[in-house]
A protein has these predicted regions:
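Histidine-centered divalent-metal-coordination microenvironment in nucleic-acid enzymes
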Residues: 142-158
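Acidic, His- and aromatic-enriched active-site or binding-groove loops in soluble protein domains
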Residues: 166-184
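Terminal catalytic/cofactor-binding subdomain
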Residues: 5, 10-11, 16-137, 146-148, ...
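Short regulatory "switch" loops immediately downstream of catalytic or recognition motifs
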Residues: 57, 157-160
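Inter-helical turn/loop segments and adjacent helix faces that build the functional surface
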Residues: 139, 159-165, 236-239
Length: 430
């Protein structure tokens, strides 16, 4: 996710240069006419999923087999940045050091935002699966997607906090590594999981966990992460000492110390950080001595943490997901950690596990960011100030590159700026 800019983008490289001779003053460009609207108050979220590839049951690197996503997807794709492309369904796809990664667009944080993000992710997964089905028929090989990881991203706007050494995104990530792992374990992990990570990514916080082949549990995990992270972001300090105020409400296992994240800077609550592997233990056994002097089960700890943040989780959750989170924490709905082993659905994503349209658009409309991006990816013209602009590319997730039809000049507009023109785009896109 790219940080939303509060000011319109400057003139892009490659635009027409001003002639040397005098000429009448030009009409201001759309992005120069007025400042972009203020970023949405709650920020944005996004989700990513990584998959390893099995070719005829053997693990392979996707870049070695397919070279580029453009050799899988038959429809034209808008280039995003680097080696990533936008799928017609709105997400981005790219190869990342031996895995295929699919990322959702930015989705503004609001009620039901995690359900929107989960829906977007699974729609893109199933689209890619269908394209791989066609590739199989053409090339005579079997291709399976094996779930590897899921990343839950929540934006962090530095301008929302006073400049303070105790309120950096790095300290926020470390603090969250002491809060998030146990409830995320119950919702997203399996018997072969090895850890839960939290990484500071400049303008966002990223929670990393195993891929979850159950869309409902994945959305529940995203909802819980949004509710907890947005609440903790409002704390007066991100120092670990703040946890001492809530030793019973926010139980931490005694002796727990996170380790550096394996892939990028950040922290991981790895199984080796605990006296016993929590991913293999019975989640209802009171095995864990906490810093508050109690002995609790994994489910009890996860339930207390969830209860503490329940008002914020409820604020951003849809009703179905809220009931599911509560049911898992109370033991009324199963956790994947209660199974003997990792389910086989992990190794055949898009076939053994699919998206059942849990949230149709009539029930949960697309977010405004999704609608803007959808128009852009389809190349639908936008008319502003009697000028027609055609989207031709993206700069990260936050900006759309347009070509003005009259003179083919290049213009870069932020998604926040384009929100002011969404109604015209919805009604007059061509």
């Amino acid at each position: 996710m790219t940080k939303n800019r509060s000011r319109p983008a400057r003139r892009a490289v490659g635009s027409r240069q001003r002639p040397a001779f005098p000429r009448p003053k030009k009409k201001p460009r759309p992005e120069e006419k007025a400042p972009a609207p203020k970023a949405l108050s709650y920020g944005a979220i996004g989700m990513e999923a990584e998959f390893t590839v099995l070719l005829d049951r053997q693990p392979v690197k996707p870049e070695d087999v397919f070279k580029s996503p453009t050799n899988i997807v038959r429809a034209p794709m808008m280039h995003r940045t680097g080696r990533s492309y936008h799928l017609p369904t709105g997400g981005a796809v790219y190869f990342d050091t031996g895995v295929i990664e699919i990322a959702t667009p930015m989705i503004e944080i609001d009620k039901g935002c995690a359900a929107r993000a989960g829906r977007s992710l699974w729609e893109n997964i199933l689209y890619l699966r269908r394209e791989l089905d066609a590739w199989e028929q053409q090339h005579g090989h079997d291709v399976e997607l094996s779930g590897f990881s899921t990343h839950y991203n929540v934006s962090f706007n530095k301008s929302d906090r006073q400049s303070s050494a105790s309120c950096t995104v790095g300290k926020l990530a470390l603090l969250l590594t002491h809060i998030l792992p146990t409830p995320v374990m119950l919702l997203a992990s399996n018997r072969r999981s090895t850890g839960i990570g939290v990484r500071p990514r400049g303008n966002r916080v990223e929670v990393t966990a195993d891929f979850t082949p159950d869309a409902s549990l994945m959305i529940a995990t995203a909802t819980l992460c949004v509710g907890i992270i947005k609440n903790v972001m409002r704390w007066p300090t991100y120092e670990l000492d703040e946890l001492a105020r809530w030793r019973r409400d926010l139980p931490v296992i005694r002796g727990f110390t996170p380790v550096p994240h394996s892939s990028r800077k950040g922290w991981s609550a790895k199984y080796t950080c605990y006296p016993t592997n929590p991913f293999l233990a019975d989640i209802d056994d009171a095995l864990w001595e906490t810093t508050g002097g109690e002995r609790l089960s994994l489910r009890e700890m996860a339930g207390r943490i969830t209860k503490f943040f329940w008002p914020t989780i409820q604020r951003f959750s849809d009703p179905f997901t809220l009931r599911l989170i509560g049911s898992v924490m109370r033991g009324r709905a199963p956790s994947l950690l209660e199974l003997a082993d990792r389910p086989p659905e992990y190794d055949s994503v898009g076939r053994l596990c699919q998206w059942d349209d849990l949230f149709p658009e009539k029930v949960l409309p697309r977010s405004r960011y999704e609608r803007v991006l959808g128009h852009a990816i389809k190349g639908e013209r936008l008319t502003m100030d009697r000028e027609a602009y055609t989207p031709v590319g993206m700069q990260g997730w936050g900006h759309v590159v347009f070509r003005r039809d009259r003179d083919r000049s290049r213009h870069v507009l932020s998604l926040d700026y384009l929100l002011d023109h969404l109604d015209e785009w919805d009604s007059g896109a061509t």
